A protein has these predicted regions:
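A short, hydrophobic C-terminal helix/tail in secreted or cell-surface proteins
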Residues: 215-219
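Beta-strand-rich recognition/accessory modules
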Residues: 2-18, 114-115, 127, 200-214
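Acidic, contiguous internal or C-terminal segments within carbohydrate-active enzymes
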Residues: 17, 27, 114-155, 159-161
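Short acidic/polar mixed-charge low-complexity motifs
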Residues: 19-22, 41-42, 82, 124-126, ...
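Beta-strand-rich N-terminal accessory domains
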Residues: 1-63, 69-78, 87
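Extended, loop-rich substrate-binding clefts of extracytoplasmic carbohydrate-active enzymes
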Residues: 2-7, 82-135
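Active-site/ligand-binding surface loops and adjacent short beta/alpha elements
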Residues: 152-154, 162-214
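Hydrophobic residues embedded in beta-strands of well-ordered beta-sheets
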Residues: 13, 106-108, 139-141
Length: 219
């Protein structure tokens, strides 16, 4: 297991178990995981052309959403005068992250702390830490959010994986909850009704599992 620089120009590092199992991530572009290869298969979709244009948001990989997911339905900051409105999905995905690598424990740790930049939008002192453990056939995340302020800190947190799926016929939900949150009306809805409108967004209310079966096994 080792950590090495994969693409110096783009600031991408690779965290590798072996040649068939690794992840790539970019600390300076929101700590985003750009690629996850498991047993030789690319699990994530990633738009490399868009990534090279730093004026555009990243499409693909696993962006980190903090301190909100989605948009706030307001034209001004919820924290009052003197603060900028929080951007869509928050600011974490646009900032440079710190990282460390624990070879003995076999995990990568990503850090984001409050700064002058974050306090333009969000008047709180915080530390966000994400431990990423790479295993054969799995990628595990442990998220710790530490409120260092003296008052309550409202947060949303999300991981936004883009899965590399070629055919929806091979998708299967396991233990899918009956109900979900309708994002447009902020009401409880039937999950299958909402999945038929999945392009509009759906929040499942309990844990679920999405399985994808490759139509052609790897040689």
């Amino acid at each position: 297991m080792k950590l090495e620089l994969s693409n110096k120009a783009q600031g991408i590092f690779v965290f590798r178990l072996d040649k068939n199992n690794y992840i790539k991530f970019c600390p300076e572009r929101g700590g985003v995981i750009t690629n996850w290869v498991s047993d030789g298969n690319e699990i994530l979709y990633f738009d490399e052309t868009r990534f090279m244009d730093k004026t555009k948001s990243i499409r693909g990989g696993i962006p980190i959403l903090f301190p909100i997911c989605g948009n706030l339905n307001t034209s001004s900051s919820v924290f009052g005068n003197g603060y900028l409105q929080l951007p869509q999905h928050g600011f974490a995905r646009d900032l440079q992250w710190q990282y460390s690598f624990n070879e003995n424990e076999r995990f990568l740790c990503l850090f984001l702390n409050a700064s002058k930049q974050t306090k333009k939008y969000y008047p709180f002192d915080f530390e966000l830490k994400i431990e990423v453990t790479l295993k054969i056939n799995s990628l595990e995340f442990e998220i710790t959010i530490n409120n260092k302020s003296y008052f309550a800190m409202p947060i949303n947190f999300g991981l936004h994986p883009y899965f590399n799926v070629s055919d929806f016929k091979n998708l299967e939900f396991v233990d899918n909850p009956l109900n979900c949150q309708n994002q447009e009306r902020n009401t409880i809805s039937n999950t299958w009704d909402e999945l038929n409108k999945i392009n509009l967004g759906v929040d499942l209310l309990t844990y679920t599992c999405l399985l994808y079966t490759s139509p052609s096994p790897r040689d």
